[in-house]
């Protein structure tokens, strides 16, 4: 996902993120998860990587997330929403369900390889950007990552 980001990094703000010192001093072990993001922008697109993380590797329903991307080009664009979670783009979860084989068979290896490919959460959507801003609301499961790409190329 990071390899799909290009351009200049842009500021991200939110009220569900742990700060750097808290993560450095005690990691993410409190009551709540760390929901944070990285974002970048080029002349043709904007990308946002959003995560919901906790040191306790416990799956869960997650949290509602609102992502507002500002400074976009007005007009039509295409939104791509990719996801890594317990059910998508996650060969580790598939490997555990296989019984954690130390020496996967050729068939298991192919399944693992395919399950690790980045998947779209939904079909690409046509969106209309107004006032240079696009707001997106979605549920982000615990221990999951979403990658949003807003592409204004025609």
Model-derived segments and spans:
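Generic detection of short hydrophobic beta-strand segments and adjacent strand-loop junctions
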Residues: 10-20, 63-69, 123-129, 138
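Acidic, Ser/Thr/Pro-rich beta/coil linker or hinge segments at domain junctions
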Residues: 72-131, 135
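Carbohydrate-binding surface patches
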Residues: 27-75, 81-95, 142-149
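Short, charged low-complexity linker/loop segments at the C-terminal edge of domains
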Residues: 7-12, 89-90, 153-154
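Catalytic cores of secreted or luminal carbohydrate-active enzymes
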Residues: 1-27
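Generic detector of short, locally flexible boundary/turn motifs and exposed helical patches
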Residues: 12-15, 32-33, 45-47, 101-103, ...
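Hydrophobic, Leu/Ile/Phe/Ala-enriched alpha-helical segments that form helix-helix packing faces
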Residues: 2-6, 69, 113
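Beta-strand-rich recognition/accessory modules
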Residues: 128-154
């Amino acid at each position: 996902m990071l390899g799909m980001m290009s351009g200049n990094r842009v500021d991200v703000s939110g009220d569900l993120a742990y700060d750097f010192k808290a993560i450095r001093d005690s990691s993410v072990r409190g009551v709540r998860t760390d929901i944070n993001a990285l974002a970048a922008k080029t002349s043709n697109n904007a990308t946002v990587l959003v995560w919901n993380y906790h040191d306790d590797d416990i799956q869960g329903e997650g949290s509602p997330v609102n992502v507002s991307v500002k400074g976009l080009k007005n007009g039509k664009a295409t939104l791509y929403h990719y996801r890594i979670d317990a059910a998508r783009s996650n060969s580790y979860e598939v490997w555990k369900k296989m019984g954690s084989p130390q020496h996967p068979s050729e068939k298991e290896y192919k399944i693992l390889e395919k399950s690790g490919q980045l998947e779209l959460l939904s079909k690409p959507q046509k969106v209309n950007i107004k006032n240079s801003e696009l707001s997106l609301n979605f549920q982000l499961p615990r221990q999951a990552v979403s990658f949003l790409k807003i592409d204004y190329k025609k």
